[in-house]
Amino acid sequence: MELLYENSLYKLKIKNENVTIILADDILRNSLVNKMFLSGINVIALSNKLYTNNLRDELKRLDLNDEVVKTLNCDRIIDTDFKSLSMQDLAYVHIIIGLSKLPKVILLYDILTYLKKDDKDKVIEFLKQRNITIINFTSCEEEFLYCENMIIIDGNKVIMEGLTKEVLKNEKVIRRLGFNLPFVVDLSTQLKLYGVLDKYYYDTEELVVVLCKKVD
């Protein structure tokens, strides 16, 4: 089946039924949910009703396996009453439910921003290990590095697109659009400008190792 969603910003065409879309935006959810349900595409939003008391019971109700829970080490929330969870953990619950459907493609719409950094990193690592295609709509600079390719949209125009590492080299354009560079990219850019580094870095641990060697 093929789903076509179009608004003033972009046109999204999905041909694969094994797709999960996780949204923080209820308005977008309401405009998509009926069409996607008929297309066999899973739509999950923060407003989705949870019919049980905790994540373990919800996964059983949905007849989903607990592979994702075990892989992501979700012991701290697996049996916690939903009513006791923070907004961050509730967002994590919805993402875990979406991942437990083991989609081939997952579209994340402003949802990763809700997560704690450790949880966010675990989700991305899981997706990459399972070779699940990630489409992440975000305005959070630190999330730019999660995907190999990047598209910057302003109004109804595509400003830049290409490999993320190449797009991020256009610092002036990115800042003009109101964004900052991810911290590690910004720091390595400044250090390169002053001759401390000879290239850009996109991984914090790698940059720390290089800087420690220079200090030694």
Regions from the language model: what does each represent?
Residues N131-Y146:
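Conserved H-loop
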Residues I14-N65:
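ABC ATPase nucleotide-binding domain signature region
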Residues G155-K157:
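Conserved ABC ATPase "signature" C-loop
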Residues I96-I106, Y114:
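A short, proline-enriched helix->beta-strand linker immediately N-terminal to the Walker B motif
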Residues E161-G162:
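ABC ATPase "signature
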Residues D66-M87, L102:
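Conserved ABC nucleotide-binding domain
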Residues M1-L9, T20-L23, I174-D216:
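ABC ATPase nucleotide-binding domains
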